Amino acid sequence: MADEVPTAVPLATPAGSSSLSFTQGFLLGQLSIAILIFCFIKFFIFGEPPSADDRALHLNSLRRARTLAHQQSYKQLRTRANSTSLSLRHKPSTSIIRKGEETRGGPSIATILAKTYYNVKGHQPESLDWFNVLIAQTIAQLRADARQDDAILTSLTEVLNTGSKPDWIGEIKVTEIALGDEFPIFSNCRVMPAEDGFWYGPGSTGNDKERLQARMDVDLSDVITIGVETTLNLNWPKPMSAVLPVALAVSIVRFSGTLAMSFIPSSSPPSTTAPMPSPTSNTHRSSSPSRPASSSGAPPHRPTTLAFTFLDDYRLDLSVRSLVGSRSRLQDVPKIAQLIESRVHAWFDERAVEPRFQQIVLPSLWPRKHNTRGGAPEDTEAAAEGEEGLDEDDFAVVDGNGTAPGSTSYIPSPIAENVTLEERIEAEGAKMREAEIRAGVRKPSASQERSRGRDDRADGMRWRGALPR
């Protein structure tokens, strides 16, 4: 009888082992996720931020690298512009003003420094104590005006809520404003030639003449605070699914840096020889509003401006307080402080840190009669009455027949519209002379005395101040 081959009997595995391995894997996965979340919260959100010195050093290195890159690109652009403009020659303009020694639009830097007895290399920096006093008075007045009412709170709230704002940010409300009590201190002022690329506006190739700049150190240690409240809205799966209240308070505790200022002179488009107008064109111009005579292709007029910027080695220390949540609140989250601080530095770098600069158009400093103050009250009233409406705008554009086109702020009297400018000036001069005679500053002429006497006899009254006849 043949031997029977034994068949392998499968080992019976307990059912609990498979469920145990699944449970172990599930718990291990949950534990790993919990560890990752814990590490993220501990080291990313609540991690200790770097010190203020380390942050300032890192930001200064980044800004310096950006400035050096801009200077290199500017030098290349200026080299190409000089090579292409060698063949261009400006035509000499005819002027009735006698030219001085410098025939290229003004004295050079060396001439200015020599005539003002200023040695750039040997002159000691100035303290600017007088300038600090003037700036402190101005800032104190601005703070006093802002504390009178809540207008600054209302205006800041409107500014923060207008414009493009993400839909996940609720209404922003300004809750706190502290304007500080200290004043900036300017010191160590020195004058030097302006560096290339810092003082040329858009569209300029840098062919302009060199300019001087004044550099001064600025230091402000104060607490200037703005506090806001808003909400973070979760709009998924439906709008306003969850709302997270957030309160922030950002304070500037210190600012130090170097301020550079320079004057940018005005530039006018080159004058072109205009053809003689025909009678028909004069008639058409008198019936239509005046337009600038320059063509559209001519460069625009650039007024005199004051440009200022801060060097890239400035330091801005901020203090950010945060409060997130309604019941279980998170207070002073370091990551929120870092994000806000980086945004503030980026906003300031894009506007007032080299190579970018701010320009302020300077007003006209020519003495004007209607800007005169002081003296006797009668003189002030007479000057105000005589100069009412006679502004620079009245003489800016004049038609060919001598009349000012359009409507101005000056309304002389309900007389004919074709009164010439000379007649208007003569009438205003008569008003001023009459006011001076009434105030006793000026004696009347013989013709005025005779006409005054006839008026007195006709009315049966004597002119006040005149001698009895």
UniProtKB/Swiss-Prot annotation:
Family assignment from sequence similarity: Belongs to the MMM1 family.
Annotated region (Disordered), positions in chain: 266-304, 426-469
Stretches assigned to the Lumenal side: 1-25
Main location: endoplasmic reticulum
Keyword terms, alphabetized: Endoplasmic reticulum, Lipid transport, Lipid-binding, Membrane, Transmembrane, Transmembrane helix, Transport
Written domain comment of the UniProt record: The SMP-LTD domain is a barrel-like domain that can bind various types of glycerophospholipids in its interior and mediate their transfer between two adjacent bilayers.
Quaternary data: Homodimer. Component of the ER-mitochondria encounter structure (ERMES) or MDM complex, composed of mmm1, MDM10, MDM12 and MDM34. A mmm1 homodimer associates with one molecule of MDM12 on each side in a pairwise head-to-tail manner, and the SMP-LTD domains of mmm1 and MDM12 generate a continuous hydrophobic tunnel for phospholipid trafficking.
InterPro entries in the record: Mmm1, MMM1_dom, SMP_LBD
Native source organism of the sequence: Pyrenophora tritici-repentis (strain Pt-1C-BFP) (Wheat tan spot fungus)
Single Gene Ontology BP annotation: mitochondrial outer membrane translocase complex assembly
Pfam families listed in its UniProt record: MMM1
Known role: Component of the ERMES/MDM complex, which serves as a molecular tether to connect the endoplasmic reticulum (ER) and mitochondria. Components of this complex are involved in the control of mitochondrial shape and protein biogenesis, and function in nonvesicular lipid trafficking between the ER and mitochondria. The MDM12-mmm1 subcomplex functions in the major beta-barrel assembly pathway that is responsible for biogenesis of all outer membrane beta-barrel proteins, and acts in a late step after the SAM complex.
Domain SMP-LTD: 124-363
Biased composition (Basic and acidic residues): 426-439, 449-462
GO annotation, cellular component aspect: endoplasmic reticulum membrane; ERMES complex
Compositional bias annotation for Low complexity: 266-299
Topological type in the membrane: Single-pass type I membrane protein
Transmembrane segments: 26-46
GO molecular function, one term: lipid transfer activity
Lineage of origin: Eukaryota, Fungi, Dikarya, Ascomycota, Pezizomycotina
Localisation per UniProt entry: Endoplasmic reticulum membrane
Cytoplasmic side: 47-469
Protein name stated in the entry: Maintenance of mitochondrial morphology protein 1
